[in-house]
């Protein structure tokens, strides 16, 4: 089996060949993955914003952005620059410290969660044994920032939006965790790398989408609720509470909420692809393709091609899910707050618990198919 390309080892070895000491080469590697993570997440957000505008325009028989760059691809960049230079206003009776800290608490955990997202066999910043559990834990911090922002704004609409965000997150965090736990039970690990490897070897037939159809639906609904996407955008419903917790924000602080929302959407799509769609795995096993073509598994060129295809497959799967989320925005109407809570507590929670127990029973009965 091809173990993939070792980026860290190759980078350090290249610097050592240039004459740098081993310690210096390793020190230069340390900040590089985090820097690339931030750059990649930011570029991903710009692409998603442009795609959402174009897809939304097509759904409404409009053109969408077209003047800022070819096909309007620079429109998200222009919007970002506009937000950076806008005046940052803090309401007179707001709590300035909590008002400023709120957006940071919303964005920071989302960026940190990218540490455990693998794009290939060795293309991950840190392969933690509890990687997927870390993502669930970090996703629980963002609602605290939203509630803090709503409370600190000293605005009734902002406070109501923050309370809605907290209630929504608590309602859907548990079904989300149960659906992830079912995957971890089948994979015998909480590591994102191990979860993808458990789906390898049989191509598309080995993906968890076939073994966890109920968990897949629960995870997707809960992920949309966690990202506050329609039909679950009650914390910032314009027709009801102006802009929710964002009402009093402007400038870069408002931009942080904007960026955090889309970064979280891309992150949820990536995690979905890792858990249910085989992550970086190709629909046809590349090892078998290499064998049919007579290519050596240890060939350096095959390692480079495998790494490139792994990144491409992961990104394509994630953006396909983003495309579905954008279509849902213009297809499904917003639910009421009572419908939102009833769906989470009275339907998704018991169904996710039954799915978890059923997965445990199937693992004992059919250990080969369910990772026993």
From Swiss-Prot:
Q: Which InterPro entries match?
A: NADH_UbQ_OxRdtase_su1/FPO, NADH_UbQ_OxRdtase_su1_CS
> A single GO CC term, please?
plasma membrane-derived thylakoid membrane
Q: What is its EC number?
A: 7.1.1.-
Membrane-spanning parts: 29-49, 97-117, 130-150, 176-196, 204-224, 254-274, 308-328, 347-367
Q: How does it sit in the membrane?
A: Multi-pass membrane protein
Q: Which Pfam families match?
A: NADHdh (PF00146)
- Catalytic activity of the protein: a plastoquinone + NADH + (n+1) H(+)(in) = a plastoquinol + NAD(+) + n H(+)(out); a plastoquinone + NADPH + (n+1) H(+)(in) = a plastoquinol + NADP(+) + n H(+)(out)
- Keywords from the UniProt entry: Membrane, NAD, NADP, Plastoquinone, Quinone, Thylakoid, Translocase, Transmembrane, Transmembrane helix
Q: How does it assemble?
A: NDH-1 is composed of at least 11 different subunits.
Biological role stated in the UniProt entry: NDH-1 shuttles electrons from an unknown electron donor, via FMN and iron-sulfur (Fe-S) centers, to quinones in the respiratory and/or the photosynthetic chain. The immediate electron acceptor for the enzyme in this species is believed to be plastoquinone. Couples the redox reaction to proton translocation, and thus conserves the redox energy in a proton gradient.
Q: Which family does it belong to?
A: Belongs to the complex I subunit 1 family.
- In Swiss-Prot or TrEMBL terms, this protein is called NAD(P)H-quinone oxidoreductase subunit 1
- Point out the gene that encodes the protein: ndhA
């Amino acid at each position: 089996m091809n173990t993939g390309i070792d980026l860290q080892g190759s980078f350090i070895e290249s610097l050592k060949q240039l004459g740098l000491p081993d310690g210096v080469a390793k020190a230069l590697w340390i900040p590089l993955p985090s820097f690339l993570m931030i750059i990649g997440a930011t570029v991903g957000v710009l692409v998603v914003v442009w795609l959402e505008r174009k897809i939304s325009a097509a759904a409404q028989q409009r053109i969408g952005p077209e003047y800022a760059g070819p096909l309007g691809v620079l429109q998200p960049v222009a919007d970002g620059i506009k937000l950076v230079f806008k005046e940052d206003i803090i309401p007179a009776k707001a709590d300035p410290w909590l008002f400023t800290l709120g957006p940071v608490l919303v964005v920071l955990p989302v960026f940190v969660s990218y540490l455990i997202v693998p794009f290939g066999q060795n293309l991950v910043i840190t392969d933690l044994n509890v990687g997927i559990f870390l993502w669930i834990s970090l996703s629980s911090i963002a609602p605290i920032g939203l509630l803090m922002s709503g409370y600190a704004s000293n605005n009734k609409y902002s406070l109501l939006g923050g309370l809605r965000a907290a209630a929504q997150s608590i309602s859907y965090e548990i079904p989300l965790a149960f659906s992830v736990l079912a995957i971890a039970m089948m994979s015998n690990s909480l590591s994102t790398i191990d979860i993808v490897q458990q789906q390898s070897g049989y191509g598309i037939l080995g993906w968890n989408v076939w073994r966890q159809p109920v968990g897949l639906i629960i995870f997707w609904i809960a992920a949309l609720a966690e990202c506050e996407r329609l039909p679950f955008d009650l914390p910032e419903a314009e027709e009801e509470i102006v802009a929710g917790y964002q009402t009093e924000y402007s400038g870069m602080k408002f931009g942080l909420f904007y960026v955090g929302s889309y970064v979280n959407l891309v992150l949820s799509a990536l995690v979905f692809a890792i858990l249910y769609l085989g992550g970086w795995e190709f629909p046809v096993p590349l090892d078998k393709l290499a064998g049919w073509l007579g290519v050596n598994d240890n060939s350096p060129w095959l390692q480079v091609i495998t790494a490139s295809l792994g990144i491409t497959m992961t990104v394509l799967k994630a953006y396909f899910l983003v495309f579905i989320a954008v279509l849902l925005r213009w297809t499904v109407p917003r639910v009421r707050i009572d419908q939102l809570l009833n769906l989470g507590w009275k339907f998704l929670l018991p169904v996710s618990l039954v799915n978890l127990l059923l997965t445990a029973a199937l693992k004992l009965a059919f250990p080969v198919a369910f990772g026993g």
